[in-house]
A protein has these predicted regions:
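Flexible "arm" and connector segments at domain edges
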Residues: 1-57, 61-106
């Protein structure tokens, strides 16, 4: 997702909330995210088109971003934190792998 796409989604989400189209609580958004996961699984199971699967993944991303905004977190900062967290995990995993004489997990 490019920053422009992310910024656009955040702007549309904010506009929707200002218009009164908003979630009532976090649980509703979590339920929506779970529903989107189920729709992704179903689309894959039914061997639907890549475009359809991508659309469902986009819906899941939207739900996650909605939850972030609803909870009052800065989306960019949240993404930066998870990027750092994942990079640190990968660094540790690579060190363990190298210590075992391997170059990768394949």
């Amino acid at each position: 997702m490019s920053n422009n796409s992310l910024e656009t989604l955040i702007a549309v989400e904010t506009d929707a909330r200002n218009f009164g189209f908003e979630w009532q609580n976090r649980e509703m958004i979590i339920d929506q995210a779970i529903s989107e996961c189920e729709e992704i699984r179903e689309a894959i199971h039914k061997q639907e088109t890549d475009a359809r699967i991508q659309e469902e993944i986009g819906d899941l991303l939207h739900a996650a971003i909605s939850l972030c905004i609803f909870a009052g977190y800065d989306v960019e900062q949240t993404l930066e934190k998870i990027s750092t967290k994942f990079a640190n995990r990968m660094s540790a995993l690579k060190k363990i792998t190298q210590a075992r004489g391997l170059t990768n997990l394949k």
